[in-house]
């Protein structure tokens, strides 16, 4: 087909396609030029690596291949649904749909995986292989057995797709089987105790060497999945809603009452040291999971983990979100500083590709990019975290939940075109305003 069309026609069609894609560019008004360059590069690498015609989702490095690096060769992991998918959802929904199709076409493997561990429903593997969706990492390591939160990211991605598109047919025919399956998996995974419902022996984002009880990120994400599944069950007049809401509302969250912060897990203490202890897992439950707690508890939890983030920043994924947490607490200078250390320091010139680890903090790590989780994390920080955008079944005008506090020097975040429920909208989030707004084209 390409030979028949000829090079010039293909080139013209490619330019036309990119002209449309760039209408979803995230504009950082007032920011120093390097920030816009970083945002544009991240946007390009993400959209260049995901397309509506893809049948294998995208891997941790998108289309890049690094022969000197032995990880993630075609593996599809939680990073995609958590960090890459949300930015695509509103700017290129067809590409986002393709990422979900990869999961929906491999639910049999997730069902077998859950059964193998003695659970019901769907448990997606930690590192999914494109051929049939089975686990592809052949190691006897704790995180393969206990790091199960990938299923929560997958389910929330399907819920977000339905909220953003309003596609009722997709909900009934595709999304529901995943949401119901993961909700049933959570139901069989929790243990009822005098404290409510608990998830024991889990490994979260920090990837400790040993599993912990009641990992804050895992429990918050599980509660969000159950509430989403319950809402859709009522919408479709299916069973399960009351049970799922009951578990979600009483899923135990470890809180240090004396210091007033959400603990990363049951055994977590403030005197623990090292990168794993400093990983802000509890904050990841606030964003991008959107688990709500009392505002005072949220603020003090953010303060607690940002005070320890020096030991963590430079590691993958959550580093790119640190600026959001500082902004939520009203620290504009801190937000800029954390984005610098949590994202800009990962980026390699001259092509502005984000590495897996910070080049400044870990100069001996191999140069490998563009790493989808980090660049996606920065994009969703700008598109969702700083604008207060939380997708839900409500009308789009009600999606914005927070006052606009941007990094120091940034005046606004604007996107000329986002796709919301089949229509094109313009996003405007101006520093100091009470809420961001969507304007229909």
Q: Which residues does each PLM region occupy?
A:
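Structural helix-adjacent loops and short alpha-helical linkers that scaffold large soluble proteins
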Residues: 28-36, 50-56, 89-100, 151, ...
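Helix-terminus loop motifs that line ligand-binding clefts
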Residues: 50-68, 94-156, 162, 169-173, ...
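Acidic/polar, glycine-enriched structural segments that form the non-catalytic walls/loops
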Residues: 1-71, 441
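Alpha-helical support elements that line or immediately flank enzyme active sites
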Residues: 41-48, 79-96, 106, 152-168, ...
